Amino acid sequence: MAMKAVCVLKGDGPVQGVIHFEQKASGEPVVVSGQITGLTEGEHGFHVHQYGDNTQGCTTAGPHFNPHSKKHGGPADEERHVGDLGNVAAGKDGVANVSIEDRVISLSGEHSIIGRTMVVHEKQDDLGKGGNEESTKTGNAGSRLACGVIGIAQ
């Protein structure tokens, strides 16, 4: 049975968006789609963070969702956090149209992202290849521009 989730991204600045998640069945890939506006042109890190706690903005969402204690990586890497979805690209108009298919995240079970926080970052994620310690944790993606808790949708 298909499962769906949604996330409304908001931050302190102009960045906002709505992201949809759909998984046809357990074990199938999750299709991530939506739009984020108010970004600067270029690539922005896009990750699922550990907690669904936005009580103090995006900072209380904790680190990337990483149940297997792996190093940060890109979406196609074997060594990656479950929440590592790479980058979204914004055009000159500041709009990023999101279209990602990921086989590691899930909407149920051990890798479920339901109740966790989706975050879009200030800078490009270097996918763990930046050559420093921060790269292996966050991809040097910088501050958290907007976030929202991922919830079950109909």
Curated annotation (Swiss-Prot):
Expression sites by tissue: Expressed in lungs.
Entry annotated with the keyword Ubl conjugation: no
Swiss-Prot/TrEMBL induction comment: Expression is induced by hypoxia.
Cofactor note: Binds 1 copper ion per subunit. Binds 1 zinc ion per subunit.
Modification after translation (UniProt): Palmitoylation helps nuclear targeting and decreases catalytic activity. Succinylation, adjacent to copper catalytic site, probably inhibits activity. Desuccinylation by SIRT5 enhances activity.
Annotated CDD domains: Cu-Zn_Superoxide_Dismutase
Name of the molecule in the record: Superoxide dismutase [Cu-Zn]
